[in-house]
C-alpha cells in the first residue's frame, strides 16, 4: 500500500512518508522518528504527533501548512478520537514509509487473500 486513508471532519486524506518527508520530519523532531517511542514505555507528545501528521500529508495534499495540520488534528479529535488513538496511525504511516516492517500476516490470511 502506498498510503493510508485518514479522515477528519468528513474529509479524506492520504498519508505517506517519502524519504524527503522523513528527512524533514527528523529535522523537525530533532531525532529519528522511531525515537519518539523511547523504550516503549512513553507515548509521543501531541507536538510530535502533529509533526508526523504534517510530514505524512505532504505527498498527496500539496500546500497543507503546519497550521492546517493543527486544524486537521483538532477536527480528528472532535470526531471522537483521543490522542492515544493516533498511535496506531503513526505505526501505519511508518509502515507505508518503510520506517518499520509491515505487519506479518499468518499463512491462512495470505491464502484467503489470494483466493479473492
Where are these regions (language model features)?
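A short secondary-structure junction motif
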Residues: 55-59
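Short linear motifs in exposed loops
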Residues: 16-17
